[in-house]
Swiss-Prot record:
Residues 72-138, 345-398, 628-746 are cytoplasmic. The keyword Transmembrane helix applies. Belongs to the PRM1 family. This is Plasma membrane fusion protein PRM1. It comes from Coccidioides immitis (strain RS) (Valley fever fungus). The lineage of its organism: Eukaryota, Fungi, Dikarya, Ascomycota, Pezizomycotina. InterPro entries: PRM1. Residues 1-50, 160-323, 422-606 are extracellular.
Amino acid sequence: MQFSRFIPRSSPGLPPYGAHDPPMMQNPAPTTAPPGAITPYLGFKARLSQIWINKWTILLLLVLARVLIAVTGLNDNMASAKREALSACTSVESMGSAMASMPHYMSKGVNELTASGVERAVNGLMSMLLLTVTGVEEVVVFFVNVLTQTYLCLITLAVSGSLHVALKVVEDAADFLNKTLADVTEGIEKGVDGFEDKINDFLKGINSITSAFGGEKDPPKLDIGGDLDKLKEIRLPSSLDEGLKKINDSIPTFDEVNKFANDAIRYPFKEVKKLINQSLEEYKFDRSVFPVPQKEKLSFCGDNDGINSFFGKIGSIISTAKKIFIAVLIAGAVAACVPMALLEIRRWRHMKERASLVQKNDHDPMDVVYIVSRPYTSTAGLKIASWFKPGRRQVLVRWIVAYATTTPALFLLALGIAGLFSCACQAILLHAVKKEVPGLTNEVSQFADKVVMSLNNASEQWAISTNRVIADTNDDINQKVFGWVNTSTTSINDTLNVFVDKTSDVLNDTFGGTILHGPIKDVLYCLIGLKIQGIQKALTWVYDHAHVDFPNMPNDTFSLGAVESIANDNKSDPESFLASPGDKTADAITHVVVRVTEAIENAIRTEALISTFLIALWFAILLIAVLRALTLAFRRDKPRGEGGIDATYHPPAPRAAHAVGSMEMSDFYNVPLTGVPNANGDGGLAPKYSTTPHVRGGSRGSDTDEEEYQAQKLGYAGQRDYEAALNREMCRESSCGQVMYGSEKR
């Protein structure tokens, strides 16, 4: 690819630039249109009149239009989302009302279940009580009989044995005494008779002596016969053992005690069994006493609910963002006119400055046109090219800049940047909308809380009323059934006390005043009293604990499952009872808004990808230019002798009119690739090129000239130091506003 091609030297000769002009036109003085003159091109004021349609203002207005379209679409999407959310809310409201009315529908079944449970429990309890009462009755009677019979046996053993021994001792003592007294009396009589005989003999001797003295007395007689007769008549009274026999005959058999105790013990048991038998088939739980909660009608989709407030807030945010975007972008579009006006003024000056290059014949006309028509991109190319060494690389760098900054390429880049800026504006708006989505989620969670609260209130009221019925049932059963149990325990306790008292009375009547009374009372307390106390303690425990207590219904009977469902929302893959199965969002209502925001986000992402692709396409163009320039930079061009062409621009040198005809087009001019200093020092408009033709077959001068010549053979158009030439332009502005250049006369 050649950047500037000219007619090869083998072509027919053409007159050099300006050869056909008269001598005075070969170096014409720069001329400009007078102020106010009509020109076919736009003047300074005309250019300023179109500042308002500069590219940046237009781009900002296009961005504004795209943002307004996005805002309109977002409003439409939010309106659609609101309709869907309200529809979903209505469905949730209906489902929530149905759930809140669950106690109404479930209470009948639960009430029937509770009533049946109570009936079966009471019937089973009565059957058990009937069997238990009968068993306890027989056990108590048996135990009391065991105690009384045992005590009777012990008393009979102790008292009868003692009395029989005592009677035997008394009888033996009486027999022994009667026999002994007879023998003693007979012995005494014999002793007294012998003693009396001896006394009489003794007295007879004494009387014989006394008769000698003249007196005689009769001896006294010892007469104890009467006393001995009394002694013989001593006998133990026959009534000595009558008391013992009476005691033996009066030992109680406790038949009356047993009969009294049995009757007293069996009476309460009979009454309890009678009551149980009467109530066993008659008990029927009254189901009408159970409460039935009313149906619930929830309403959280009205005018003052969170959904309308959420979408109202979203609409307010969108409206505010729309106003902000309109104000900012319009202000930016208007503000862009100021720097663009300054740039247009500068461009106009540069164009007038560089327009003088067109009149010079020592520059590539195409390059000059490019510099004049694209002042900023060409200036950028010149600036960047100045970083490299003079020569082909500078030309290639300028060509890269020119290739990447063509009008289509810049339009592509500007379109991509504007698209990204539009996406950024839409993303800001979408971010503001998405920030409010958690608020809707909170509102929806409050819907669930409302459902659970209503459900919990209904469940609690039902549980309170049901528990009151259960408490009344407990009291009724405790009074009708266990009331007799308490009465029976009290009666049995009293009966045992009466039994002990009656037994004590019998013993007092029997052994009162005897030595056996104390031991028998001790035996009674040890054998019966301690046992009776144990029975009384047991009866007291039965009295204290003999009552039925059916369990109450918990307050969360109908709301427990809903509460657990909400509690499980914080776990992985939650599925709220307000959400449809398979929803990945918190609930169906939030899913509507999330779906809309995700659709808008996908659209923004698509636009961003398209804009990025446009920018990437511009970079691809830049890469193509760089690769092409690198290829040309490192490729050696063929010399003319090998079939190559001279790609270097050689402007004709200004000559006199008479010399034009003698100049051949085939002459080769030694044109340096860099700017040549002005030898005259007059600040020329542009660098001058050497017009010394190469003399074929002659010497080229020094080796340096030879190297320059070889380098210049491969030159390209546009390698001239235009920037230096332009910098050397001395311009000024006259009082009338006309731009005058350094070469102009003042």
